[in-house]
């Protein structure tokens, strides 16, 4: 799923790409990936690295493109023996193009959009948006750690 967001005064969905908008790509199809590579000429290995569930967090720069891979919290299935894990979130940027790509639908990204819309403000620039993504990730890590600690305490008392 691909969503284009105007990020200037408020976070508002728009029908197509415009310079300086945010392109949020969640669970991209092969067609979505092809379009990103062809329309924006992003390095093809960026998307394959983001799709690798074991990819480590890192920063990379190639031909003017910046790639940041974050590991963000993800709950596989609450009934799973190990429901908590992390998945890669790719942030791709060059001049007037900012794209986030995650091959999983995560509560963090849903909440990030919802929270920014409730704030009623956009982002000052792509750096502001990236730092807010880092902050959101930290908040969700703390939330998941509290849940894990509660489960540990419950297991101790049983």
Which sequence ranges carry the predicted segments?
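Peripheral, non-transmembrane regulatory/ligand-interaction domains of membrane transport proteins
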Residues: 1-158
């Amino acid at each position: 799923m691909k969503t284009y967001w105007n990020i200037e005064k408020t976070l508002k969905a728009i029908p197509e790409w415009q310079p300086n908008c945010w392109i949020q790509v969640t669970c991209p199809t092969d067609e979505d990936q092809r379009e990103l590579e062809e329309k924006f000429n992003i390095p093809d290995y960026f998307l394959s690295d983001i799709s690798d569930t074991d990819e480590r967090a890192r920063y990379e720069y190639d031909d003017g493109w910046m790639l940041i891979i974050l590991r963000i919290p993800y709950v596989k299935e609450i009934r799973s023996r190990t429901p908590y894990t992390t998945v890669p979130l790719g942030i791709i940027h060059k001049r007037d193009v900012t794209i986030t790509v995650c091959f999983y639908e995560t509560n963090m990204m849903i909440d990030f959009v919802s929270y920014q819309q409730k704030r009623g403000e956009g982002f000052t620039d792509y750096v502001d948006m990236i730092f807010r993504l880092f902050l959101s990730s930290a908040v969700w890590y703390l939330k998941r750690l509290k849940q894990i600690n509660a489960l540990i305490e419950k297991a101790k008392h049983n």
